[in-house]
Amino acid sequence: MYKRQLVGSFLLALPISSATGEAVPYIDALFTATTSICVTGLVTVPTYSTWSVWGQIVILFLIQLGGLGVITVMYGVMMGLHRRLGLGNRWMLQDVFNLNNISGIVRFLRKVLIGTLVVEGCGALLYMTVFVPGYGLRGIWISIFNAVSAFCNAGMDIMAEDSLCGYVFQPMVNLVTMLLIILGGLGYIVWWDVLRVLKNIRSQKLKCFRLLTLHSKIALTVTGILIVVGATAFYIFEYNNPLTMQDYTVPQRIWASLFQAVTTRTAGFATIPQEDLTNTSAIISVLLMLIGGSPVGTAGGMKTVTIAVLLVSMFATIGNKEDAELFGRNIPKQAVNKSVAVVSMFFIIASLSTILLSVVTDADVIDIVYETVSATATVGLSRNLTSMLNLWGKLIIIVTMYLGRVGPISLVVAFSTQKKNKNIVKNPTEEISVG
């Protein structure tokens, strides 16, 4: 992944990529390439005014590459060249996508690519109903860019410096953006599982939710809970905030609260200035950013299923139960171990990044935590700190974004390798005290 990151940075550092024709400083080109391929959305320079159309095309390609995953895009290229996918890549994709066998890998990837293009295309067409009247022909490019960025949970746009704050009350922009974010964040496994169930519903008249896999049940349930609880919390704590929602009507508060609850789940778009949020809302946003979206999707974060498994395991331990159960099914020990590893990794990365960033900047602690968690969970929301970072601050965030995106994937591969190569000889067990 770092090779594509470097290639992208070199392309963005070319004068042709700059709107002024003068080369952008390499550190900003590297930062932009990293935030694009990691689908984060934090930017040190305004995307809409700094980059030329060519530069924006490079950014969009990196976003699509990062959102879909390198192997998925590679398959698309190989399919176009009529080449076959290697057995090693098939095994890795089986683990990453959590499929039962490798026989359906090619078919699944084809569905992912086609489904992604269809959803992004529909989103772009809906955006055009708003952006073309407002921006003319340029609105077509803006619509395409926003659709890909929203679906890939990147949160980058080419309209203005204040993201979507000018569209806080625009129903179409709000609905399309939230829908694309949610669809991308739910993950491809949930997509096809829901479609499979809907087909069975038509033919067998069975209850929909009961037919879903455990993975889909957890992802959909946790996603719904986080959106409702998050939106309610933002509505309450921003109700009397003169800098955000105090002067809004009730419907406008609902729109703004819903969008904030959705976008903090690793999207990065904003309809209200993040630096104007109350400290309580900022802390809630940090928690939502850490949780993120669902596995095998375009979102980042620790993932909804990971948090659910960890909580269920915790309550099972407290209740002195041998197995963690959810929706009438036992959670595999391997899933519990993986969840602990992912959560631990995220907290370590975010903590170290926060400490290091606090050394090189004198910003408020809440702003630093917001920035580092946003980078770790590849969200892209900032309390106006990113553009003020010095060289060391930019390097810290670049590394944080990279680790936050690559780390979970590396853990999945590590656990899958461990599963296939179990040690026959084990060391003796000895009890220790914890807690």
Regions found by a protein language model. Name each.
Residues 3-435:
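Membrane-proximal intracellular helices of multi-pass ion channels
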